[in-house]
């Protein structure tokens, strides 16, 4: 473990730097490092950079005299070769070490290896200038990669087997972006402060991923540094949000603010511009319409992520939104005379779990099961106001911005000139609230006319059956989430929702708790599991697949034959459920037949006396006595459907009468 000192290049460009001619002479060795010829796409991406304004700099990114992109005076091809050589050695060396649990000191370890140009006993010879390669928290990042199902050989194959592809439209941050040839990973150069902040973030990031792997936050797979000629170039490996094989017709960078949140004229002239908040509100006033289940899962994931970012005091992050218009894509293909998609490049199955937008909110790739991605291509199905079918690719980006002194000063200065609530930079708590409200009310909206249909493998919500809307169809105000609906998305901790490791189908959406004291309901469902009680929502006649935590317990055998009469002491059971204002739940099951029914005078607790179905099958006039018992119960949580000999528990059933036989649903 070593303590890293910031290099002088972070504050000044001058220093002991090799000449650009020397670096340019060495730049052709990057492909030789990977022992492959440069792919045509890579050549195009690099030759597309130079233009009339070559030599201009944006941050540390620039263009040299030959037209090649540079970063801190280092050519892009040289940087790519050094990254591939360093990652190839460090990951291979780490895989030879036995696996173990992650310790606290593992988050602060920095391993360093020197790569002389002539080679050494540990490193191969290369055509670059001598450089040192640093790996931050190698054991911790190895755990993160394993958590997302990335094997070391797949990681090395994606990063080192093929040349990296430079993105021609990196954005205004001054960073360089590389994407692997299989669209799996993104490599981004980061500043010293961002790398330092990520190191401090790792323990909390580790805890958050353990509790909730379904997240829209960036998936960090590695943090490295190339040190050469007095320059430190730090890079981070992340998941790729926007796959290149899927054509994105629109791309948005959304923050929830309005001050200077419109794409500039220069940005709009690009072949693939990035629009902002005001552009979205102008072009899509109806928002993006999702079916109810997908909307609920997405909103919960967003709120959970906002809470995590707020706890880390992170602000100024964005939601990167890529929109693939299915109908427009089909029209474009028909205009080109294409009759089928057999000749088109189809997206291959990604190696990382939870890597696509749909998996991030549903966790559909758990337990090694492959998702049918031919139809959705990993995107979230939606429609726009014109009824066109869309696939959304989303993710939260730029989370390495903490609310430090400089950001506080920036917000204070902007607030003096403009409305402080409209500027981008703001305190983390306000920023998270504004970000979430904008996404859940303006960008994404619930449309009840959209229904989820299972795919070939029975994955609920994987495909979308869209009911076309007319071009003049107005957006109903009832589709906008109300305050009561928004309150239902309040977080109760990651473990309050079904996890992917639980028993049952792993692809089901998280169940939305009832509005009756969500924490109390979750506690009741957990506590009553030992007594075979659980919260139902739909009867088996309505659907053949019951969500987890929603079951019905039959007191008689499935074959319809009456059971033997149990002893008299077990015939009569009394279940007392007391719900106090403090959300405490007590369950008492006395064995005595003469136990009384307790009831709170304030009405905060409810008691009911239940006779088992085995006793009712032996007594004459059982339906009549059962109906009279239900009439005596003032506020029952347990009722008896008249069509079947079974009891159903519902925490929101306050009616003294059982529901009609034709309904078959609880009043949840």
Swiss-Prot record:
Classification via CDD domains: PIPKc_PIP5K1C
UniProt modified residues of type Phosphothreonine: 668
Annotated spans, Mediates interaction with TLN2: 641-668
Residues carrying N6-acetyllysine: 265, 268
Principal localisation: membrane
Effect annotated for changing residue 650 to N: Does not affect binding to TLN2 and localization to focal adhesions
One Pfam entry name: PIP5K
GO cellular component, one term: nucleoplasm
Superkingdom as given in the UniProt entry: Eukaryota
UniProt keywords, alphabetically: Acetylation, ATP-binding, Cell adhesion, Cell junction, Cell membrane, Cell projection, Chemotaxis, Cytoplasm, Disease variant, Endocytosis, Exocytosis, Kinase, Lipid metabolism, Membrane, Methylation, Nucleotide-binding, Nucleus, Phagocytosis, Phosphoprotein, Transferase
Effect caused by changing residue 253 to N: In LCCS3; loss of activity
Omega-N-methylarginine found at: 459
Enzyme Commission designation: 2.7.1.68
Residues with Asymmetric dimethylarginine modification: 459
Topology with respect to the bilayer: Peripheral membrane protein
Modified residues (Phosphotyrosine): 639, 649
Keyword flag Acetylation: yes
Illness association: Lethal congenital contracture syndrome 3: A form of lethal congenital contracture syndrome, an autosomal recessive disorder characterized by degeneration of anterior horn neurons, extreme skeletal muscle atrophy, and congenital non-progressive joint contractures (arthrogryposis). The contractures can involve the upper or lower limbs and/or the vertebral column, leading to various degrees of flexion or extension limitations evident at birth. LCCS3 patients present at birth with severe multiple joint contractures and severe muscle wasting and atrophy, mainly in the legs.
Known partners and oligomeric status: Interacts with TLN1. Interacts with TLN2; interaction stimulates 1-phosphatidylinositol-4-phosphate 5-kinase activity. May compete with beta-integrins for the same binding site on TLN1 and TLN2. Interacts with ARF6; interaction stimulates 1-phosphatidylinositol-4-phosphate 5-kinase activity. Interacts with AP2B1. Interacts with AP2M1; phosphorylation of PIP5K1C by CSK disrupts the interaction; clathrin competes with PIP5K1C. Interacts with CDH1. Interacts with CSK. Interacts with PLCG1; interaction is abolished upon EGF stimulation.
Role: Catalyzes the phosphorylation of phosphatidylinositol 4-phosphate (PtdIns(4)P/PI4P) to form phosphatidylinositol 4,5-bisphosphate (PtdIns(4,5)P2/PIP2), a lipid second messenger that regulates several cellular processes such as signal transduction, vesicle trafficking, actin cytoskeleton dynamics, cell adhesion, and cell motility. PtdIns(4,5)P2 can directly act as a second messenger or can be utilized as a precursor to generate other second messengers: inositol 1,4,5-trisphosphate (IP3), diacylglycerol (DAG) or phosphatidylinositol-3,4,5-trisphosphate (PtdIns(3,4,5)P3/PIP3).
Protein name: Phosphatidylinositol 4-phosphate 5-kinase type-1 gamma
């Amino acid at each position: 473990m070593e303590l890293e000192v910031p290099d002088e290049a972070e504050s000044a460009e001058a220093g002991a730097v090799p000449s650009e001619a020397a670096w340019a002479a060495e730049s052709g060795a990057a492909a030789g490092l990977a022992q492959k010829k440069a792919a045509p796409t890579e050549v195009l991406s690099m030759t597309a950079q130079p233009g009339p304004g070559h030599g201009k700099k944006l941050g540390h990114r620039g263009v040299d005299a030959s037209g090649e992109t540079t970063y801190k005076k280092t050519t892009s091809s040289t940087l790519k070769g050094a990254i591939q050589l360093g990652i190839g050695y460090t990951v291979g060396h780490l895989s030879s070490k036995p696996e173990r649990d992650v310790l606290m000191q593992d988050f602060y370890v920095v391993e360093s290896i020197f790569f002389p140009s002539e080679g050494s006993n540990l490193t191969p010879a290369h055509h670059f200038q001598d450089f040192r390669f640093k790996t931050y928290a190698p054991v911790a990042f190895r755990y993160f990669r394993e958590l997302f199902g990335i094997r070391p050989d797949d990681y090395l194959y994606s990063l080192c087997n093929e040349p990296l592809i430079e993105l021609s439209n990196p954005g205004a941050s001054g960073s360089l972006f590389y994407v692997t040839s299989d669209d799996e990973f993104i490599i981004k150069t980061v500043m010293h402060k961002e790398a330092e902040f990520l190191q401090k973030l790792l323990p909390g990031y580790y805890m958050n991923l353990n509790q909730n792997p379904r997240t829209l936050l960036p998936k960090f797979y590695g943090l490295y540094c190339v040190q050469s000629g007095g320059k430190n170039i730090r890079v981070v490996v992340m998941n790729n949000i926007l796959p290149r094989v899927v054509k994105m017709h629109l791309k948005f960078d959304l923050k929830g603010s309005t001050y200077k949140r419109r794409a500039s004229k220069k940005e709009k002239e690009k072949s693939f511009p990035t629009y902002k908040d005001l552009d979205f509100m102008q072009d899509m006033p109806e928002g993006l319409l999702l079916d109810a289940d997908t909307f609920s899962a997405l909103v919960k994931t967003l709120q959970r992520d906002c809470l995590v970012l707020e706890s880390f005091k992170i602000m100024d992050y964005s939601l990167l939104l890529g929109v693939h218009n299915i109908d427009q894509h089909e029209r474009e293909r028909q205009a080109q005379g294409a009759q089928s998609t057999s000749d088109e490049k189809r997206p291959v199955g990604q190696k990382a779990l939870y890597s696509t937008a749909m998996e991030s909110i549903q966790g559909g790739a758990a337990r090694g099961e492959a998702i049918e991605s031919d139809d959705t291509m990993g995107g979230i199905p939606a429609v726009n106001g014109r009824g066109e079918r869309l696939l959304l690719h989303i993710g939260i980006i730029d989370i390495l911005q903490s609310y430090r002194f400089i950001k506080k000063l920036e917000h204070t200065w902007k607030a003096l000139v403009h409305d402080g609530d409209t500027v981008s930079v703001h305190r983390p708590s306000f920023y998270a609230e504004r970000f979430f409200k904008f996404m859940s009310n303006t960008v994404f909206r619930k449309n009840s006319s959209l229904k989820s249909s299972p795919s070939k493998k029975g994955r609920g919500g994987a495909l979308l059956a869209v009911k076309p809307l007319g071009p003049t169809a107005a957006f109903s105000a009832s589709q906008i989430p109300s305050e009561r609906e928004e309150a239902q998305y309040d977080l109760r901790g990651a473990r309050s929702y079904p996890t992917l490791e639980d028993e049952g189908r792993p692809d089901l959406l998280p169940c939305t708790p009832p509005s009756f004291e969500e924490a109390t309901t979750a506690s009741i469902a957990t506590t009553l599991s030992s007594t075979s009680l659980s919260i139902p929502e739909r009867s088996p006649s309505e659907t053949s697949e019951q969500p987890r935590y929603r079951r019905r317990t039959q007191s008689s055998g499935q074959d319809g034959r009456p059971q033997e009469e149990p002893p008299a002491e077990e015939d009569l059971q009394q279940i007392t459920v007391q719900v106090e204002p403090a959300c405490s739940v007590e369950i008492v099951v006395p064995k005595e037949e003469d136990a009384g029914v307790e009831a709170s005078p304030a009405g905060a607790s409810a008691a009911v006396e239940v006779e088992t179905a085995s006793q009712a099958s032996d007594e004459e006039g059982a339906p009549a006595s059962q109906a009279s018992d239900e009439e005596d119960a003032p506020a029952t949580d347990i009722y008896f459907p008249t069509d079947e000999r079974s009891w159903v528990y519902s925490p929101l059933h306050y009616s003294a009468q059982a529901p009609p036989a034709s309904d078959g649903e609880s009043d949840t």
